[in-house]
């Protein structure tokens, strides 16, 4: 037998000459090639468009998330690839109203799209889940049932004097601090007000920010923690990166853990203080305790209260800041808003949430602000149930992580005409151009924001009272 009859004999000398290191590298290269081939041609999501690197790695996803630019990158990708984009090996992003309904809303005959493990990072002390972090639908429904009493129309009406107390002090303090040369940073002051309101309702006492004009240290810690959530998600997607990061930056990890423990301990101390002093004050805790089930522990009450503070403060302040910015940039919009408020109320004392909620232009202002600058710009990831399901006409395999990014949806020319223009009138006119349902600042379905009515009360009272009393202008003309 010669080499022509057995060509494999020609390879044997070369193969036997390979060093273990070379063999390993060749094997690794073949494995990577096979992996990439599978991700691009055989994976259940291979047919969906997106950057090639997203098919085989989470690097692109995490890079922009940690940078804080992910929402705008997703807008760019949707403009390039269409209404559905593969953003990671097992992730799809959508940007349509239909996808909002299919992913988040209740659909008869369809299984629930449960929250992804992204929410596991929100577990409180002693592994207590809250209304936000609980992923199991049955347990979440149980929580929502006993918490809903605190957010009912009757409860919110009883809570309005507590809200008004902060709002009125806010208006007074604007005169004290705003009369100084250089004006005030209204973003800071809106945060002081909304944190004070939610503190009063969640813990029975405000943080005193409006009175002092200073940010409470605990609030600074919360805002920092929100920014760290991106790093936590990256650790989940790259466990080895997490190990390396902890080894390279032990002090940074230690600081993060200390901040988390400090936040939890302070929250628990506030709850313990409130529980030790029974009160009929019509706040969240009173309503929660009135309807307290046997399985609701003190730590879990603290977890819920923590969620209320995080979800119900900075988001509202963001919307208020956005409104004021566009009011100062658009004289005609400013004139319409102030005229509506000042024509409606003869006296400052006449302004209340019921009357303010009937101000149509003010309502449109808020809707447009939440569209052009979503207060929660991050997508809320869900998992496609067993057997797969259809989303906006696309069949998606089970186990896929799916979501709608608010920025990608609200700033898409497919959903809104001239999406970068601040145009409150789009919410007052009947037109066939804008798809209003593509903007869902409070989400929808069984996991929709429990405090949306509270948010509307805060928005309407703070804006109407401030604009009834003051004329405002943007002093820093370089702000854009």
From Swiss-Prot:
Functional pathway: Sesquiterpene biosynthesis
Residues annotated as glycosylated are 265, 352
The cross-references to InterPro entries, in alphabetical order and at most eight, read: Cyt_P450, Cyt_P450_CS, Cyt_P450_E_grp-I, Cyt_P450_sf, Cytochrome_P450_monoxygenase
Q: Which UniProt keywords apply?
A: Glycoprotein, Heme, Iron, Membrane, Metal-binding, Monooxygenase, Oxidoreductase, Transmembrane, Transmembrane helix
User: Which coenzymes or cofactors are required?
Assistant: heme
Q: What is its main location?
A: membrane
Q: Into which EC class is this enzyme placed?
A: oxidoreductase
The protein's matches in Gene3D superfamilies, at most eight in alphabetical order, are given as:
Cytochrome P450 (1.10.630.10)
Q: Where does the protein end up?
A: Membrane
Q: Which domain of life does the protein's organism represent?
A: Eukaryota
Give EC number(s), comma-separated: 1.-.-.-
Query: What membrane topology term does the record carry?
Result: Single-pass membrane protein
Q: Where are the transmembrane segments?
A: 9-29
The UniProt entry's GO CC annotations, sorted and at most eight, read:
membrane
List ligand-binding residues for heme: 449
One of the protein's GO biological processes = mycotoxin biosynthetic process
The entry lists its GO molecular-function terms as: heme binding; iron ion binding; monooxygenase activity; oxidoreductase activity, acting on paired donors, with incorporation or reduction of molecular oxygen
Is Nuclease one of the keywords UniProt gives this record?
no
Name the protein family.
Answer: Belongs to the cytochrome P450 family.
Q: Give the protein's function.
A: Cytochrome P450 monooxygenase; part of the gene cluster that mediates the biosynthesis of PR-toxin, a bicyclic sesquiterpene belonging to the eremophilane class and acting as a mycotoxin. The first step of the pathway is catalyzed by the aristolochene synthase which performs the cyclization of trans,trans-farnesyl diphosphate (FPP) to the bicyclic sesquiterpene aristolochene. Following the formation of aristolochene, the non-oxygenated aristolochene is converted to the trioxygenated intermediate eremofortin B, via 7-epi-neopetasone.
State what protein this is by name: Cytochrome P450 monooxygenase ORF11
User: What is the source species?
Assistant: Penicillium roqueforti (strain FM164)
Lineage here is: Eukaryota, Fungi, Dikarya, Ascomycota, Pezizomycotina
């Amino acid at each position: 037998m010669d080499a022509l009859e057995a060509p494999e004999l020609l390879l044997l000398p070369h193969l036997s000459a390979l060093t273990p290191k070379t063999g390993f590298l060749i094997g690794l290269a073949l494995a990577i090639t096979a992996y990439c081939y599978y991700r691009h041609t055989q994976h259940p999501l291979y047919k969906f468009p997106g950057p090639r690197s997203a098919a085989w790695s989470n690097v692109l996803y995490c890079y922009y998330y940690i940078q804080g630019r992910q929402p705008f990158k997703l807008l760019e990708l949707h403009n390039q690839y269409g209404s559905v984009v593969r953003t990671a090996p097992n992730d799809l992003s959508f940007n349509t109203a239909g996808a909002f309904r299919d992913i988040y809303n209740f659909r008869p005959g369809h299984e629930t799209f449960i929250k992804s493990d992204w929410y596991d990072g929100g577990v409180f002390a002693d592994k207590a889940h809250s209304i936000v972090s609980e992923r199991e639908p049955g347990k979440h429904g149980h929580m929502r049932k006993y918490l809903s009493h605190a957010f009912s129309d009757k409860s919110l009406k009883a809570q309005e004097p507590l809200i008004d107390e902060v709002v009125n002090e806010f208006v007074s303090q604007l005169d004290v601090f705003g009369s100084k040369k250089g004006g005030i940073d209204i973003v800071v002051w809106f945060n002081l007000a909304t944190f004070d309101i939610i503190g009063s309702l969640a813990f029975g006492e405000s943080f005193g920010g409006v009175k002092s004009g200073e940010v409470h240290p605990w609030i600074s810690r919360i805002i920092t923690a929100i920014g760290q959530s991106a790093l936590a998600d990256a650790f989940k997607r790259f466990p080895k990166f997490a190990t390396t990061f902890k080894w390279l930056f032990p002090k940074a990890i230690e600081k993060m853990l200390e901040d988390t423990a400090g936040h939890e301990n302070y929250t628990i101390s506030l709850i313990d203080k409130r529980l030790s002093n029974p009160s009929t004050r019509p706040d969240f805790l009173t309503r929660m305790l009135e309807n307290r089930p046997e399985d609701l522990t003190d730590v879990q009450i603290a977890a819920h209260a923590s969620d209320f503070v995080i979800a119900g403060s900075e988001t509202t302040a963001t919307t208020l800041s956005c409104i004021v910015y566009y009011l100062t940039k658009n004289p005609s919009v400013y004139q319409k808003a102030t005229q509506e408020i000042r024509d409606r109320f003869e006296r400052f004392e006449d302004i209340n949430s019921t009357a303010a909620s009937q101000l149509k232009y003010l309502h449109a202002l808020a809707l447009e602000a939440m569209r052009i600058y979503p207060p929660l710009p991050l997508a809320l990831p869900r998992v496609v149930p067993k057997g797969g399901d259809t989303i906006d006409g696309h069949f998606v395999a089970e186990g896929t992580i799916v979501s709608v990014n608010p920025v990608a949806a609200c700033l898409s020319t497919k959903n809104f005409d001239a999406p970068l223009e601040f145009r409150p009138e789009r919410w007052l006119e009947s037109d066939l151009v804008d798809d209003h349902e593509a903007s869902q600042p409070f989400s929808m379905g069984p996991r929709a924001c429990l405090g949306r009515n509270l948010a509307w009360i805060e928005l309407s009272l703070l804006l109407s009272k401030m604009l009834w009393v003051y004329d405002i202008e943007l002093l820093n003309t370089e702000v854009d």
